[in-house]
């Protein structure tokens, strides 16, 4: 067989330089000397008979050939990492790392408990949690940067044919008010009363905001008429704003358990309106699924669904 004109170490160096933007920073990230990685790149360029970086730029900029090699080299390195993980799995969860993604609310309020339960049973498995928007996390799963993710919204349209989505539980979204608000003394509030409230809201691109607007619209409520006092990108900031009397807000029930227990906000029921969204596990079915990934998925199903549902959802996963 003809020898390959590059090594895995050379591909790792190329990837590090492209990521860090300079040979010096790449050398530091790889814990090697700058002359060593410069020599590796020179050898690689000679073996391939191409220039991989633009000369004369302060920033390490890839040439067209360099970008092409990086694209395919990244796939080669990812496949090598999958191979190593598959071999590690032969030891039946005796170690390894599970990288979990989560959207903002689930990552902040749900995942710490789930990861804690998983670590109690499998302490030898290291767990990393990445919390971002549903869109970013979905792309991380698609690209293989995350093993699986728990999200509370829909995956981006362009990824719906790429990712496998398994819905496992409902998450109710509650309308919360300051305890001092007059409506907190009422029973159910009427739909028309919503137009009299001042709202603290997530930005319009958040998945929770989209779910809320959609469900309210189905009940004949036009959320575009709401008085939005301010938009924030943090659930904690929104809760603090409500507690301070700045307005009302829709948040996940999982995010206000402590506040309800302490009685510092009021959960207002809207007459004949319940807002719920589905929580889902997403994976990339075209990538290797480690035993840790499969086991964590099964643990979630065991916690949240009935035995009959568990069998159906397990078959999907």
Curated annotation (Swiss-Prot):
SUPFAM superfamilies: Periplasmic binding protein-like II, Winged helix' DNA-binding domain. Gene3D superfamilies: 3.40.190.290, Winged helix-like DNA-binding domain superfamily/Winged helix DNA-binding domain (1.10.10.10). InterPro entries: LysR_subst-bd, Tscrpt_reg_HTH_LysR, WH-like_DNA-bd_sf, WH_DNA-bd_sf. It is found in: Plastid, Chloroplast. Belongs to the LysR transcriptional regulatory family. Residues 6-63 form the HTH lysR-type domain. Trans-acting transcriptional regulator of RuBisCO genes (rbcL and rbcS) expression. Keywords: Chloroplast, DNA-binding, Plastid, Transcription, Transcription regulation. CDD domains: PBP2_CysL_like. PANTHER family: HTH-TYPE TRANSCRIPTIONAL REGULATOR (PTHR30126), HTH-TYPE TRANSCRIPTIONAL REGULATOR CYSL (PTHR30126:SF39). Signal peptide: none annotated. Its main location: plastid. The keyword Secreted does not apply. The keyword Nucleotide-binding does not apply. This is Probable RuBisCO transcriptional regulator. One of its GO terms (molecular function) is DNA-binding transcription factor activity. Pfam families: HTH_1, LysR_substrate. Residues 23-42 bind DNA. The lineage of its organism: Eukaryota, Rhodophyta, Bangiophyceae, Bangiales, Bangiaceae. GO terms for cellular component: chloroplast.
């Amino acid at each position: 067989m003809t020898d390959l004109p590059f090594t895995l170490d050379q591909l790792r160096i190329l990837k590090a330089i492209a990521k860090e933007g300079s040979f010096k920073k790449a050398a530091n990230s790889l814990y090697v000397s700058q002359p060593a990685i410069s020599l590796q790149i020179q050898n690689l360029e000679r073996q391939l008979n191409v220039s991989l970086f633009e000369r004369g730029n302060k920033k390490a900029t890839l040439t067209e050939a360099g970008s092409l090699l990086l694209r395919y080299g990244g796939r080669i390195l990812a496949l090598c990492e999958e191979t190593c993980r598959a071999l590690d799995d032969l030891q039946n969860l005796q170690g390894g790392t599970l990288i979990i993604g989560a959207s903002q609310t689930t990552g902040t309020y749900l995942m710490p408990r789930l990861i804690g339960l998983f670590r109690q049973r499998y302490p030898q498995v290291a767990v990393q949690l990445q919390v971002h928007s549903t869109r970013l996390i979905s792309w991380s799963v698609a690209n293989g940067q995350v093993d699986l993710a728990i999200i509370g919204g829909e995956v981006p349209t362009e990824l719906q044919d790429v990712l496998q989505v398994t819905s496992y539980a409902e998450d109710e979204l509650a309308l919360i008010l300051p305890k001092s608000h007059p409506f907190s003394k009422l029973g159910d509030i009427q739909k028309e009363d919503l137009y009299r409230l001042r709202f603290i809201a997530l930005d319009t691109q958040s998945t929770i905001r989209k779910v809320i607007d959609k469900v309210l619209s189905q009940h004949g409520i036009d959320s575009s008429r709401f008085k939005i006092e301010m938009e924030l990108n943090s659930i904690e900031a929104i809760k603090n704003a409500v507690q301070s009397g700045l307005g009302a807000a829709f948040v996940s029930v999982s995010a206000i358990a402590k506040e309800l227990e302490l009685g510092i906000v009021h959960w207002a029921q809207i007459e004949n309106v319940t807002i719920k969204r589905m929580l889902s596990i997403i994976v990339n079915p075209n990538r290797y699924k480690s035993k840790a990934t499969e086991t964590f998925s099964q643990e979630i199903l065991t916690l949240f669904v009935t035995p009959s549902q568990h069998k159906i959802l397990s078959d999907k996963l």
